[in-house]
Amino acid sequence: MAAMAAIPPQRYHYFLVLDFEATCDKPQIHPQEIIEFPILKLNGQTMEIESTFHMYVQPAVHPQLTPFCTELTGIIQGMVDGQPSLQQVLERVDEWMAKEGLLDPSVKSIFVTCGDWDLKVMLPGQCQYLGLPVADYFKQWINLKKESVLRLPGELSDPRGWTPLLFAPKPEACPFHGSAPSPLGGAMSDLTWTLRRYC
């Protein structure tokens, strides 16, 4: 069973910041499909970004993005047309993980997300629908939203469930700080900045 990990000091060599974008509409479409797969590799000691993985994914069940999805994610149809399938992207992720030394048993790394949706719901749900295995490294993660609540007891949460730390003003020099939702922007920027504040 997948489990959310806490953030012990200096336990991890690398933090892998991840934030999927997926097909969506109002009312919600089923199944949702991942259309953007970004990962930032942060050094656990320096908190500097050492490497990035970024690919768009061609949705199979609902190949045409809705106007709602484009408005919400900033991803247009041309960004996903002709892109690899989720299976192919997962193979590329595994190759990237190996190239970065993240599959070495002596290297401790963990994914970091804002919420449990990405790795508890979205990825395993789509993999189950498509009959694809889920790699073990996706089965444990740090939910930074929940972790921030634990580390900031007594502070009021934002109405959307985020704590004020995640919405605190960020210096303009913060990498990926800005309004563009994609690629490697938006929540990825907030996650990276917040993680640096913690560690």
Predicted regions and their residues:
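Metal-dependent phosphoesterase core characteristic of DEDDh/y 3'-5' exonuclease domains
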Residues: 8, 13, 30-35, 41-73, ...
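Short acidic, Gly/Ser-rich segments with clustered Asp/Glu that frequently serve as metal-coordination loops
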Residues: 20-28
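N-terminal accessory regions of nucleic-acid-interacting proteins
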Residues: 1-20
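Glycine-rich, highly charged phosphate/nucleotide-binding loops
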Residues: 81-95
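Short glycine/proline- and acidic residue-enriched helix-loop micro-motifs
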Residues: 75-80
